[in-house]
Regions:
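Phosphate-binding P-loop
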Residues: 1-8
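Short coil/turn segments at beta-strand junctions that form active-site/ligand-binding loops
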Residues: 9, 70-71, 112
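Hydrophobic anchor at the beta1->P-loop junction of P-loop NTPases
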Residues: 13
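Conserved glycine(s) of the Walker
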Residues: 18-24
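Motif I (Walker A/P-loop) of helicase-class P-loop NTPases
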Residues: 25-29
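AAA+/P-loop NTPase substrate/partner-engagement loops
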Residues: 30-74
Length: 153
């Protein structure tokens, strides 16, 4: 992936626990607010829990009823830590697979950026979300591996 980064893509930051992926994304989000509208970070576990309660994922996909009434840049933090599937009154859904599928379509049509942090490697992503999602990661994202020991104390 060296030398093949693109400003048209979002970021996919992955690596071991505690290496600073979420902190990097929070800093990047704050910086982007100075230049553009920025973006919010949403913890994937919270998204799955919200689906279990309301059954609604519009905010994270087409956003017709939230923010500014259209899709916006967004970061999904801690992908792979959410319940799979989430259950809304008997309707089971792999929430993040569904969201990433829609965000891919939005990226194709309008280059809408999505950002992700995860501890999962590409093989784990395929096992959790399928080959369709894994296959599109490099097309939609600049992939960055963050290595090192945990920085938590």
């Amino acid at each position: 992936m060296e030398g093949k980064y693109s400003l048209d893509k979002g970021l996919w930051i992955y690596g071991d626990i505690g290496t600073g992926k979420s902190s990097l994304m929070q800093i990047f989000s704050e910086y982007m607010k100075l230049e553009f509208n920025g973006f919010k970070l949403h913890i994937c576990n919270g998204i799955a829990n919200a689906y279990s309660v309301s059954g609604d994922l519009d905010l994270y996909t087409y956003n017709q009823h939230g923010y500014i009434g259209k899709p916006v840049w967004m970061c999904f933090d801690e992908l792979g830590r959410e319940a799979i599937p989430a259950n809304h009154f008997g309707t089971k859904l792999n929430v993040m697979q569904h969201i990433l599928h829609i965000r891919y379509s939005l990226w194709q049509s309008s280059r809408l950026k999505t950002f992700v942090t995860t501890n999962c490697d590409p093989f784990q992503i395929e096992s959790l979300y399928g080959d369709f999602i894994r296959d599109r990661i490099r097309e939609m994202f600049n992939v960055i591996l963050v290595e090192g020991n945990s920085r938590r104390q």
